[in-house]
Structures are given as C-alpha cells and as structure tokens.
C-alpha cells in the first residue's frame, strides 16, 4: 500500500483569493493545501484590466505568501486592447485572460456576451501571438422566455460548447481552457478536440476539474448552500465522467480548484446565496482521496503537477520556491470553520469530514 508520493511542484490552475481581510486569510492557505503554483482569477471589484493593477495585486499576494508562485490574469472586457495584451505579456505580468459570460457567477457583471465573441477577436489574435491562455467560464446565461430553447443551470455548460469549438476553429493555435467542467458532454467535447493529441506539449484546448465537482451531484447542493457553486454540480453520470477524466492520465485534464471563499453569512442567505465552494486549505488531500478510491494514485502527479505546468509552460526559474510537495498517509479532520479570529469566517468543503492524506514540504 502506497504511504507517500513525491508530487514535485504542484499547481492549482484556478484560484480565487479575493481582496482585503479575506485575501489575507486565504492566500497563505494555498501552500497549506499542498499547492506550490496558483493561477489567480481577476474577478475583483472592479475587475483587473490594467497593467498597474495586476502587478500590484501580485505584489500583495507575494507578500502574503512568499513561497507560493502566482500566475496572474486579466479579465476579458472592452477595456482590454491588443497593445495592452502585448505589453503585459512582454513584461511577464499575465499568463492569460479570463472570460466570464455576463451575470453567470460571482463578480461577472462586467463580463461578455457569450453568443458573439467577434468583438474580442483582435484580443484573441494578440493572445495567440503571445502564447497566452484564454480561460473560459463555459456557461450561457439562463433564458426562460420567448421561443428560444430554455437555458438553465443544468444545461448552461452544454449550451456553451459550440462557442468553444468555434473559438478553437477560428484560433487553432490559441491555448484555451474550459474551466471547471461539470458535465459529461463537456468531457466528451474536450476529448473529441484532442483525439489526435499524443503528448502534453501538443495540447491546445484543455479542461480544468475541481475537487468539489468530483464529489458532488445536484442532491448535495439543492439543500446545502455551502456546496452551491457555478457551474453547479449536476447528475451522477456527469460526476462519473468527471472522475474518469481526472484519473485518466490524459494531459488535457488537470487540476483547477475554483476555490472560492465567501464569508459564512453570505452562504447562509435564504435568497441570493453566493456561488462558490472553499477548498483551498485541503486541495491536494481532497484530490488524493478520489484517486485512491479509483486505484489511480499513479496518475495523481500528472493531474496536480505535470499537465498544468506543461500547458502553462512554467519554468523552474519562475517559481518562488523549489520545495516539493510530499503527500503522505496521515488522517486529518477538516475543521467546521476557518476564521481569521476577527471578522471573517468561512466554511470549508466537507467540513467535519476525515481525509486520509496530508501534505508536507521538502527541499528539492
């Protein structure tokens, strides 16, 4: 029985750390959860769309967690220009641009219309030239009236997939990630796009998978706001497809937690519950539990390290710390609440449950 695994430089390619007191609480927890490299989301208020702001935000994060490597991103909006994309890339200020369809998730009001991306094609062209990554929140906004086919939380991701395929056809060398996949149809689409891929360096379109979507179905959030997120967890067949993809060892599926902290009072509303699951403090142990249950621990390093590093082309010279993550057998109990002892309290994913694995850090 495996008791210890050297995971090397682990990476979580979809992380929310917010601002202010919440940021101060959760940013150091990235390393606590066994993650070395974190790709940071730009959906602050207002969104990150300027060079000065993304540089300042990274400085703030680096001060809070000096041993964590932060990869930064812009928020896709009309404020971006091709010249800004080129400048930010050449200054190594960003690794990608995140696309939020307007209104589908937290702080997405400034997002774009996913029915027509043509206005942003000059941006995508500049990104392709700079080898930047386009990160897609792959959902269409809900539509419940008129003669149009209804779109709702259970089919919003599937409705978005034709837009993903069109973007790839129009920009075949642009690196694209369908973030936090939740559906069997999304997994099939990513596999179809990659049917001729032989190795990790060939991947142009990838998908991130979260920890919580490998555990949850619709029944788990319908009566529990702590498990409510966007995109929502779906049906048992969808979860089965996600788990199969995660443990497959295919280089176009890798880890992005979409860990999204909210103050406990914002998750306890009877109306307007904030979407987001907080998983950062135990990120790698959650994933290890799934891989162990699937008898696939030999593929864990690819999912939480190698494939993400390859897709984002992270070099050793860029990392803040070369320490390696060692996963080892040691039971731990997830606390009911994580707090700064002052004003901020958050409920972690699977609060009160036991995990079989822990993480420590060792020099490489």
From Swiss-Prot:
Pathway: Pyrimidine metabolism; UMP biosynthesis via de novo pathway; (S)-dihydroorotate from bicarbonate: step 3/3
Cofactor section: Zn(2+)
UniProt remark on cofactor binding: Binds 2 Zn(2+) ions per subunit.
UniProt EC number: 3.5.2.3
Enzyme class: hydrolase
List of residues that carry N6-carboxylysine: 98
GO cellular component terms, A-Z: cytoplasm; nucleus
Gene Ontology molecular-function annotations: dihydroorotase activity; metal ion binding
Binding site for Zn(2+) 2: 98, 137, 180
Family: Belongs to the metallo-dependent hydrolases superfamily. DHOase family. Class II DHOase subfamily.
Function in brief: Catalyzes the conversion of ureidosuccinic acid (USA) to dihydroorotate, the third step of the de novo pyrimidine biosynthetic pathway.
Protein name as catalogued: Dihydroorotase
Organism: Saccharomyces cerevisiae (strain ATCC 204508 / S288c) (Baker's yeast)
């Amino acid at each position: 029985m495996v008791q210890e695994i050297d995971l090397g430089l682990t990476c979580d390619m979809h992380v929310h750390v917010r601002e202010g007191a919440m940021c101060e609480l959760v940013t150091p927890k990235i390393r606590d959860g066994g993650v070395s490299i974190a790709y940071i989301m730009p959906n602050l208020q207002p969104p990150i769309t300027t060079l000065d702001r993304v540089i300042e935000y990274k400085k703030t994060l680096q001060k809070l967690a000096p041993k964590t490597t932060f990869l930064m991103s812009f928020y896709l909006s009309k404020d971006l220009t091709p010249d800004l994309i080129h400048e930010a890339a050449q200054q190594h200020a960003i690794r990608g641009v995140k696309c939020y369809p307007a209104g589908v998730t937290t702080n997405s009001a400034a997002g774009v219309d996913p029915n027509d991306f043509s206005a942003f094609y000059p941006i995508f062209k500049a990104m392709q030239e700079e080898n930047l990554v386009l990160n897609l929140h792959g959902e269409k906004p809900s539509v419940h009236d008129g003669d149009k086919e209804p779109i709702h939380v259970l089919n919003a991701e599937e409705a978005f997939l034709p837009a993903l395929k069109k973007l790839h056809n129009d920009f075949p060398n642009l690196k694209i990630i369908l973030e936090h996949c939740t559906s069997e149809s999304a997994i099939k689409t990513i596999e179809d796009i990659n049917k001729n891929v032989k190795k990790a360096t060939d991947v142009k379109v990838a998908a991130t998978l979260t920890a919580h979507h490998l555990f949850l179905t619709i029944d788990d959030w319908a009566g529990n706001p702590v498990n409510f997120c966007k995109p929502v967890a779906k049906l048992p067949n969808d979860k089965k497809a996600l788990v199969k993809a995660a443990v497959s060892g295919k280089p176009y599926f890798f880890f992005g937690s979409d860990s999204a902290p909210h103050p406990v009072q914002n998750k306890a509303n009877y109306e307007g519950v904030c979407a987001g699951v907080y998983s950062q403090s135990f990120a790698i142990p959650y994933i290890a539990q799934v891989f162990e249950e699937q008898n696939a621990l030999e593929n864990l390093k690819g999912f939480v390290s190698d494939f993400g590093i390859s897709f984002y082309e992270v070099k050793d010279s860029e990392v803040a710390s070369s320490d390696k993550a060692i996963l080892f057998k040691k039971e731990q109990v997830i606390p009911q609440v994580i707090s700064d002892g002052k004003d901020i309290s958050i409920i972690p994913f699977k609060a009160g449950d036991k995990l079989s694995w822990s993480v420590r850090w060792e020099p490489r």
